[in-house]
């Protein structure tokens, strides 16, 4: 990894960790008498980290079923439920749950008050869906999801969601990132959907959301070597962790997911038409030529994972919570398995 890229990744993780630590210290400053009464009112029961994580994972599953549980406080649970429900309704044929090792499916750090849960699955239309949620109460709410289309839909991009809220008070940082991540820099590839995103975000149906969420252009310093981000990416830094931010960001996720599903439909039809024309010797004049082949689409998705493995600042954050070995194994086997080829 280039030194400037590593420095930025470490800086982001350090900022998030500092925000978490600040809120932890603030809680520690609570009068001891009140804290003592709270402890006395709580049954004394010890649980291992794995048992605690498993219990949190079961609670998470219940939350996913109703989609609204826990939304009395700021969270991205509704976003998680929306993506999961929509994908399973539109792309669930032939669904297979992917096995995620128990050590990675749920992990808790009781001292930090943070639990991380992950699920993964595939279907006929989707090569892989990986959804990760970090629940640290008021100190951390993070939802990250990556949806890889089946490689037969050669020119379909990867749908990515990255929603982050860490820290409390003045130390709180919120970031909203949603994109249809290109697997090729080819102009024809990007022209098939990026203009739709730009129209949607800049003066279209999401213009009010963009204003309310403080949408901005990602820093060139941070994204100068960003191979897998489109010009239509929705990137925002909301000032407040409130109901409006939850609702507006959910509107963004829904709208971008709709564009992605439409593009997936188109990419599948284009690939089928091109394949049929080639098989039967028909003219390709009226068929949009796919930029990628099934094989090159697979290679591009795997290259995406390899790039993310070296650049994603969340790995450093996970290392601060669960240790470097766990974080690296989690990144290589669960977050970005395509990096292994």
Model-inferred region functions:
Residues 126, 133-176:
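Phosphate/adenylate-binding glycine loop and adjacent helical scaffold
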Residues 1-65, 89:
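N-terminal chloroplast transit peptides
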Residues 61-143:
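Short Lys/Arg-enriched alpha/beta "domain-start" segment
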Residues 173-301, 308:
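Mixed-charge (acidic/basic) macromolecular-recognition segments
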